[in-house]
């Protein structure tokens, strides 16, 4: 069973609510009051410069702009993307025997969101697996599904990823007395969305898209995290003396905020992604010149500079810019879901030609990981 051909039977994606234009972001997420004077004086200019450099024209948030109520959960976002993938595959949810859900923040610590998604889809019996991960959650989920399908343990797998960034970007989440620019950078980069793939083994015909491989690597040993959010079972060393529960202390110290080492990410993220992509292509015995489409969903266009183009040529040995359409500007950077959203959009638009090799690759700065997946497009697509 190890050499079974695994097909991509369908893809789906979902973006909540109406598109939010750049000049509406603060209105939807809410203005941050109570910032210190020095930060407040710099904030408007910093935000406008960052939003302009990103090139993102619109994004989506699961927030009702009038009532400020949350309109989705991770499970509901994933369900909508999954149903679209199942529809593309012409399958019922009951045919799925392996369900994989990935997200950086589950809806609750227990039960797992994967089981909540199973409930929503009405799958009476299946194996469900939840992966806690940021951007590399998609290739991790695909790799697990791919190996299990090839082993013959399962016949049909549904791989989903959901990113509900707005829960920790909205103004009500912040303790503004402990906010720095490093806490706010991602506020104007991230958005909400979900994606899904249906994978199946054997008997799908030679004209179906084929999932050739998935790849993940973690290279952050000895490096400090590039992104943190201290909500979990173990507080930081300086808070370890506190009795549990310590959630209030975490909030009062502002340690619940999403923080990113902006300078380190700016200097390392692109090389991390491109080096990982090189390793993946080598592992797949694939030449960079053979790839027809590169899906590389960075948070914004400011990650695509002359320096990065030169870096890509040096690491990959070829110029990939003409083969790397950057669609994040159209729908927003919804974290790990962005690769699936772009893949789904391009598949539905007929952007892939029979025989095209399509690679999607992402990097995750939390502890310096990266990963991706490789598809050979089929003549019949999902039909």
Protein language model regions, located:
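Condensing-enzyme catalytic core mediating Claisen C-C bond formation in acyl metabolism
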Residues: 1-71, 176, 182-267, 373-383
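Claisen-condensing/thiolase-fold acyl-transfer catalytic domains that form or cleave C-C bonds
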Residues: 79, 105-106, 124, 133-150, ...
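Short beta-strand segments
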Residues: 9-12, 132, 157-163, 199, ...
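Flexible, glycine-rich active-site loops centered on histidine and acidic residues
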Residues: 150-193
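Short coil/turn connectors at secondary-structure junctions
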Residues: 2-5, 93-97, 123-127, 151-157, ...
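Conserved beta-ketoacyl condensing-enzyme motif
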Residues: 65-134, 280-307, 311
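Active-site-adjacent elements of ketosynthase-type condensing enzymes
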Residues: 108-115, 162-180, 217-237, 301-309, ...
